Amino acid sequence: MIVPLSVLEFRDRAAAYFGGRIGVIDGERSLTYREYAERTHRLASALRGLGVQPHDRVSFITYNTHQLLEAYYGVLEAGAVLNPINIRLTADDIGYILDHSGSKAVFYHADFAPLVERIAPSLTAHPAFVVMEGEPQGPATHEYEGLLAAGSPDEPPAELDENAVAELFYTSGTTGRPKGVALTHRTLYLHALQAALALRISDTDSILHVVPLFHVNGWGAPHWMTLVGGQHVMLRRFDPAALLALVERHRITHLLGVPTVFNAVLASPALEQHDLSSLRYVIVGGAPSSPALIRALEERLHVTAVVGYGLSETSPVLTIALPRQHLLTTEPPERRLERQATTGWAIPGVRVRVVTGEGRDVRPDGEQLGEIIVRSNVVMEGYYRDPEATAAAIRDGWFHTGDMATIDDEGYITIKDRAKDVIISGGENISSVEIENALYAHPAVFECAVVAAPDDTWGEVPVAVAVLKPGAAATADELIAHCRERLASFKIPKRIEFRDQLPKGGTGKILKSELREPFWRGYEKRVH
């Protein structure tokens, strides 16, 4: 028997077997899984009432809220495609995403009303606008709770093709403009099963959603935690003290976040004021980590702390650096911490190789460098409306990550460098080309290049090296102010240096590796 794969099965299972359990907590609001499921049914019905058809895109601009978690199932039940948008992007980028995706409906939190009002007039499409937690204003003609109240909880779901796109996540890349990563129903279903198995979760577990749900599928948590009937607790804005209080109050078992989040937690004066004994696992991802951070998390939080690795294009989880029992009994504790700070080993259902430029596997000695390539059902369908980028990324049946790494004799992978010119700062992907384009818009700039430099707080930050036009003058502060008018705050270069010329190869291409090297001198890895 062949049954189409759909994550809607996870919601239905949770409602059937854990219906009376509190499944979602958002501030002072709690929803049982039965209530949560009903709200997703009503959302699907309401979307149809707005004219949303199967395969239409529905965008959300909001924090980690119960409404966004409801969209992970309600939008899919309507047969539409969920497109959560990074709220840290500029109005220009968000407008581009809404147009490129052809969004039929846009849901936004009331806090973002000024942003949406600014964007709406310039959109080529004319989506329906729905405001959440506020009165209809600006382009919004509907309010979320009123829309749900008018929806039916009893309409049959749309017929779903497991190979149809279910979710769309726009990720920054080397092109400057965000690319839409298209994930199918089948991909999401299998990723949830594989991640749940790898993360060893059950219905006794609970997760605090620290990772924004617009980021790489919320690391898959909306699906794999619902699958097992675990509990979702929403964190709308990151604050270390608030995070610690929620862990104690709701007996959180799993925390996922980027290194900067956990560095802030460890530095918080509130750390010693809370009972964190419920915590079992801390998964660090989104940017490279270090043994020192893993050690600090284990010693101060009394948890198993490990690194996870993945990309938007892979749903996202590919590897987890969980310890293996036979190594625990044969290796010293220090070596265990080193392994848990690596990129890890492949989760079930994922094939990972590290290959040379000729496509041969590197030696499993932890020394020879190669590119990570992946073959799995968790890999994206492709980049939305971008066949050229898709063909460049998926070649000969393998997805090419652009991440350079080594692999040891136990299969543990360690990322050493990046082939792509993407800077990962605090878990955010930053395109060096986008920053360069902003700098080139300044009349004094002749040439420039942006590279990643190590930073103790953010892991990496963008720094720029510029050559001014003959006779022109500009200070670093002036160029930074110029960028501030054109870029999201986290994309602004933290430093600008001036040179007489930039190093170039035989074809005239700027050699960013030479520019990057002085910043990383003394570091073992070229990611931080």
Where are these regions (language model features)?
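Conserved AMP-binding/adenylate-forming core of the ANL superfamily
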Residues: V3, G20-T65, L69-Y73, T90-G95, ...
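Structural core segment of the AMP-binding/adenylate-forming
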Residues: F10, S45, G49-L50, E77-A149, ...
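Conserved pre-ATP/AMP-binding loop-to-beta segment of ANL
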Residues: G19, V131, P136, G151-Y170, ...
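Conserved structural elements of the adenylate-forming
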Residues: A37-L43, A149-P153, E167, V181-S202, ...
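AMP-binding/adenylate-forming catalytic core of the ANL superfamily
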Residues: L89, V106-Y108, L255, S376, ...
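Conserved AMP-binding/adenylation subdomain of ANL enzymes
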Residues: Y189-S206, F214-H254, S268
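Gly/Ser/Thr-rich phosphate-binding loop
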Residues: L227, I252-G257, L266-E338, R351, ...
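Conserved beta-loop-beta connector loops within the AMP-binding
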Residues: W345-I373, I407-E410, A472-A476, L511
